[in-house]
């Protein structure tokens, strides 16, 4: 159990690579907080993982990753409940399969808000606790 009692936040953890990462981290003993675009998606993923790891500490949250204040508040709550974040996995992201000349500014903003601003916001929020402790891993 290489990650025993480590606190990991995994963005985009309700499906795909993020879900598989949460599964692996739980198997290694980590306490996992996964984020999803909706609370319902987060809770569904948590339920599935709890079936496999009934004694694990796992939670789902759905902050607006494009909002630093929303991310900070969610991370503060998680830190108060589970401890300082040891590992942040920046996995959330979106893409659009739209021809460039049909790409709208709104679509561009949506992609940039999650794929760039979201990574900045989650990294900034996690780093606050990590820097104070002098340790942590951000992926």
Feature names for model-found ranges:
Residues 6, 55, 84-85, 130-139:
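Active-site loop of short-chain dehydrogenase/reductase
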Residues 7, 14-16, 38:
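Conserved glycine-rich cofactor-binding loop
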Residues 28-45:
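Conserved glycine-rich Rossmann-like NAD(P)H-binding loop of the short-chain dehydrogenase/reductase
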Residues 123-124:
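A short, exposed helix-loop element centered on a Lys and neighboring polar residues
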Residues 99-100, 107-112:
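Substrate-binding pocket helix/loop in short-chain dehydrogenase/reductase
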Residues 53-57, 76-88, 96:
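A glycine-rich helix->loop->beta "capping" turn
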Residues 39-40, 62-73, 105:
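The beta1-alpha1 cofactor-binding region of Rossmann-like NAD(H)/NADP(H)-dependent oxidoreductases
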